[in-house]
Amino acid sequence: MRAKPFDLVIAMPGGDISETFDGAALIKAEFPAVPFVVLTPFSKEVSRRIEKQDMSCIDYVFSWLGNMDLLLAIIKLLEDKLNENDISDVGIRMIMLVEDSVRFYSSILPHLYKFLLKQSRLFSTEALNQHEQMLRMRGRPKVMLARNYEEA
């Protein structure tokens, strides 16, 4: 990562989940600004093992259900998190999703972003010129994910 900078790290744990979390800790220690996302196959055993891990170096955990739209949702969610100041500074609307079930938010976020992007595209067609169309597309509501009420 020193030779070539990365904007995002997505890891899928193999048999030993602790290796993924140890690797995340090493990466976060040296590159704290780089988001680290874990994609896991959904199973009760994996969920139990993840609960025992130190999650401080992981930005998000998602359950891989085979939906390719999840990758777009992850990127959009991280973009929204980075542009969080637009909500208070510029007045961009926000949708706060408060959910602690990894499996549920992994399945709902792709649908939510697909709906928002479709609505933004429809809304942008009402603009008078291309510049206004781009502003309307980028002005879609931001989505924030909180995994508990305190985080929200």
Feature map (PLM): residue ranges:
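Non-catalytic signal-transmission and effector/linker regions of two-component phosphorelay proteins
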Residues: 1-3, 53-60, 64-150
